[in-house]
Amino acid sequence: MLIGCPKEIKNHEYRVGLTPESARELARHGHEVWIESGAGLGIDATDEEYRTAGAKIVEGPDKIFAGCEMVVKVKEPQAGERSKLREGQILYTYLHLAPDREQTVDLVNAGVTAIAYETVTGPHGQLPLLKPMSQVAGRMSVQAGATALEKAHGGRGVLLGGVPGVMPGKVVVIGGGVVGFNAAQMAAGVGADVTILDRDPEVLERVGTHFETRAKTRFSNAANLHDAVCQADLVIGAVLIPGAAAPKLVTREMLGDMQKGA
């Protein structure tokens, strides 16, 4: 199969669909791999590394979209990329179609076979391609939240871990899945006062057993959610409905009742 990997063009996207190691593995199995020149620079992978791995470097994305049987990306194709897709082509990338009707219609009209990383499911119901990104998102959320809490960034001036004589910041994590678990792990690791909300008693039991005294758990209903959010310094939304848009659980009323700078 002729497999191509264009450079990502979405703002602030630095990842690449195929690493040199991935290209080498595909070539080893008899596939021909085309990489757009510069596609790997965001991860410090040079064109020469791809050539050494057995890939062909092509200038610009047009040849890849026109000639390759499968296009491997990271983020959903932008409008300019969708116009290049052709019938019978395989598109392999994160898509997140639920909130994006325009992209969905364009993909249907293009006649492509679109495989969304986030819905690829393992034999036990797990989401192996979404999980690592969820782990990153959960951990980064605490890092970003801690920065936002600084006075210089308009925050409450709260240090999540506190110091002797000063209470730690309160972190509320909505959802105890992969994102929520990793967010709670980071927050608890710096010494924050962590509360995890979820509707699944088994999830609450699992995270409660893991964190023991380092985090509290609460059943997620409207009253408990409102109470937790209003006391929080940092709220992290981490609810996943596979293949669907995330529900909007924090209402405008709750936002209005939050502490200034939270």
Segments from the language model and where they lie:
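Glycine/serine-rich phosphate-binding loop and adjoining beta1-alpha1 elements at the start
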Residues: 2, 8, 79-170
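An N-terminal-biased, well-structured beta-alpha scaffold segment characteristic
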Residues: 2-110
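Glycine-rich phosphate/diphosphate-binding loop of Rossmann-like nucleotide-binding domains
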Residues: 6-45, 152-240
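Short beta->alpha connector loops at strand-helix junctions that form conserved
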Residues: 36-37, 60-61, 94-96, 116-121, ...
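Short gly/ser/thr-rich secondary-structure transition/capping motifs
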Residues: 52-58, 73-75, 151-157, 215-221, ...
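Short acidic active-site motifs
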Residues: 60, 223-227, 250-254
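A short, aliphatic-rich alpha-helical micro-motif
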Residues: 64-66, 85, 226-233, 255-258
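Glycine-centered, small-residue-biased loops immediately flanking beta-strands
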Residues: 262
